[in-house]
Amino acid sequence: MFERFTDRARRVVVLAQEEARMLNHNYIGTEHILLGLIHEGEGVAAKSLESLGISLEGVRSQVEEIIGQGQQAPSGHIPFTPRAKKVLELSLREALQLGHNYIGTEHILLGLIREGEGVAAQVLVKLGAELTRVRQQVIQLLSGYQGKEAAEAGTGGRGGESGSPSTSLVLDQFGRNLTAAAMEGKLDPVIGREKEIERVMQVLSRRTKNNPVLIGEPGVGKTAVVEGLAQAIVHGEVPETLKDKQLYTLDLGSLVAGSRYRGDFEERLKKVLKEINTRGDIILFIDELHTLVGAGAAEGAIDAASILKPKLARGELQTIGATTLDEYRKYIEKDAALERRFQPVQVGEPTVEHTIEILKGLRDRYEAHHRVSITDAAMVAAATLADRYINDRFLPDKAIDLIDEAGARMRIRRMTAPPDLREFDEKIAEARREKESAIDAQDFEKAASLRDREKTLVAQRAEREKQWRSGDLDVVAEVDDEQIAEVLGNWTGIPVFKLTEAETTRLLRMEEELHKRIIGQEDAVKAVSKAIRRTRAGLKDPKRPSGSFIFAGPSGVGKTELSKALANFLFGDDDALIQIDMGEFHDRFTASRLFGAPPGYVGYEEGGQLTEKVRRKPFSVVLFDEIEKAHQEIYNSLLQVLEDGRLTDGQGRTVDFKNTVLIFTSNLGTSDISKPVGLGFSKGGGENDYERMKQKVNDELKKHFRPEFLNRIDDIIVFHQLTREEIIRMVDLMISRVAGQLKSKDMALVLTDAAKALLAKRGFDPVLGARPLRRTIQREIEDQLSEKILFEEVGPGQVVTVDVDNWDGEGPGEDAVFTFTGTRKPPAEPDLAKAGAHSAGGPEPAAR
């Protein structure tokens, strides 16, 4: 039976349960159903009872007088009484007798009257409403209109007079009266848009085809134009042809929802159109106009657009539509007959200055809602920052959202109880536990003392809460430009908020931080540090990326490692680096994988490997590894990124690169490093050799890349070849990783100077850079140490010292061997492991 209930009838049942709980009754009787019918307020039953002077308060007081309040609030499910069940069964019988295939609020009321013996019937009689009179009122309302629920269910009753009611029951069911909302002050003020509103008035005043359609991007204010028209009608600021018009917005979703049988949807729509024709003063607003095309078109049926076309052409129906440019092109323009019936009105995105005026006009509404004060600086910041940093949405929508969320954020912070209140709660709970324990132990003197302590704490907490609520909550919080910047930073991940003193110090020491991982390469470290400082200080070109560099030089000197160190410095994680291996894009057709496949190709829906990552993380470091291996077409696509900081992906979306650091690595010009012609990179071999090599690399880059590509790069940095001294420093860096792993096993690792020197000697290769050192440490240290751990020669709680035998520090060291000695950590020096982890020479063990 319940599947036949309309939404309003189901709501009545829910409200009946709530009324029973409010009265502490553990059952749902006829009186609770009557309260639910009145409480629902919108159905035919509620309107019938209201017309007879029956109010919710009057019924509730009569129920309390007859039955009274219950002793205890019910828990869990509340059952229906047998009499209430009978009422629901009678409501089904009433519906069938009226020829309805649904059960609405009117049928439930008729069931209550037909039952006639319950508390509900007694209450109605006491309030002066004879049952026969109530029944006549319901039938009279149904004869004028076959029920609001009938429109909801899509079916009518039998017979009845074909008069139209004084109220717009169908339009109220499937739409919203915007002029009534404007009269009640429920609509936000509309700032500007005078030209668009005037153009809409002109189209509406035409004799035929007087149907404007507002076309614009999402969030530019199409609906606001219609609300502005509703306010103009209310204030009388419209021509004579539009005075006294009623502007209704139609909800197509409600029209379609619940139309179970063929013809239900069409019947509902025809009822709406009939009521509009009868009234003669209705202007219909259909948001998302493209949903008309195909709406309700099941097999063999016609859609809503086809039903509306004749009336739109003859001028019998005045409609305002609103849709986006893409949807208009995709749906409306394809249907030429529908398109010619609408006159397009373009709604463009407002300027930043216009957006600021809009925000100032809305300020009072948001201040009242969030109970905050919004400064002028916050308005300016919201408009300018949203315009600059949020590129996939449009003004003023994105700026309004910034203001709204900043206000919500501030209000939530103020509503959070201070920590000392939570401390009071913990102390009170602890006192209660101790008191109960004392009572269980029959220590009543202690229990009495704890009871007094509990009372004191409760009183202190109440006083502190009173101070908090009367103090902090009464002070109106202020939303300023800093709050707006913080919200934007949380949205996009772009740090646009003001620099704190700690971050300023950290940025000024950026080179020092990067050199903890990068040995040497002063030029490269300085270049990227300056780019980041320029960005955070707000002095970078707003239309270009934060920085674009080519890192050239031999393999294994730190080009990729510097990119990872930069990502770690900015985001605290090496994985924050967007790394693209350009060796995967050596063919022309593979370029589509980077930026997104075009329509019709495999992978179109997935987006590009580069564009999708940057779109989701606009503040990032992007590394194009070994750029020379990519196809030439990719360089052409990157020109726009380097110059304008944006790129269009395969789906036509603009991806913003203005807050990224772009790094290209290349090995061009380094193939001659192994030839003994004085072309090496070693600084020890003289700065002239480095300058000659730098010139060679630049010449190779000019041969391989087009001038327009190189001309857009901020800086080309040629990395130095690592010297022997830098390799020794790199030993410390790499050993610290091994020491960190041993620390988790309660072990420390210390290398003597001789061990470091031998590792550097065996791992130093001027051609291959630092990578041979990593393999040497793995072979000489990690492999041998792992065997000693497995053989239990060293173990937890020990300091492992690595030294060298059979080497005086001068010769080739072919016969030299590494030795491993484990000694107990001295209890007085618990930080040995930490010292060893930094490989700073640590304290020597007592003996070997």
Curated annotation (Swiss-Prot):
Keywords attached to this entry: ATP-binding, Chaperone, Nucleotide-binding, Repeat
GO molecular function: ATP binding; ATP hydrolysis activity; protein folding chaperone; protein homodimerization activity
Coiled coil residues, start to end: none
Keyword Repeat: yes
UVR domain ranges (all copies): 425-460
Phenotype upon gene inactivation: Depletion experiments (using anti-sense RNA) stops degradation of anti-sigma-E factor RseA.
Annotated region described as Disordered, given as residue ranges: 821-848
Region (I) location: 171-418
Record-annotated Clp R domain positions: 2-144
Residue ranges of the region described as Repeat 2: 80-144
Stretches the record annotates as II: 479-670
Stored Pfam families: AAA, AAA_2, AAA_lid_9, Clp_N, ClpB_D2-small
InterPro entries associated with the record: AAA+_ATPase (IPR003593), ATPase_AAA_core (IPR003959), Clp_ATPase_C (IPR019489), Clp_N_dom_sf (IPR036628), Clp_R_dom (IPR004176), ClpA/B (IPR001270), ClpA/B_CS1 (IPR018368), ClpA/ClpB_AAA_lid (IPR041546)
Region called Repeat 1, residue ranges: 5-70
Ligand binding (ATP): 216-223, 553-560
GO CC annotation terms, alphabetical: cytosol; peptidoglycan-based cell wall; plasma membrane
The protein's role, per its UniProt record: ATP-dependent specificity component of the Clp protease. It directs the protease to specific substrates. Can perform chaperone functions in the absence of ClpP. Degrades anti-sigma-E factor RseA in the presence of ClpP2.
Family: Belongs to the ClpA/ClpB family. ClpC subfamily.
Protein name in UniProt: ATP-dependent Clp protease ATP-binding subunit ClpC1
Organism: Mycobacterium tuberculosis (strain ATCC 25618 / H37Rv)
Lineage: Bacteria, Bacillati, Actinomycetota, Actinomycetes, Mycobacteriales
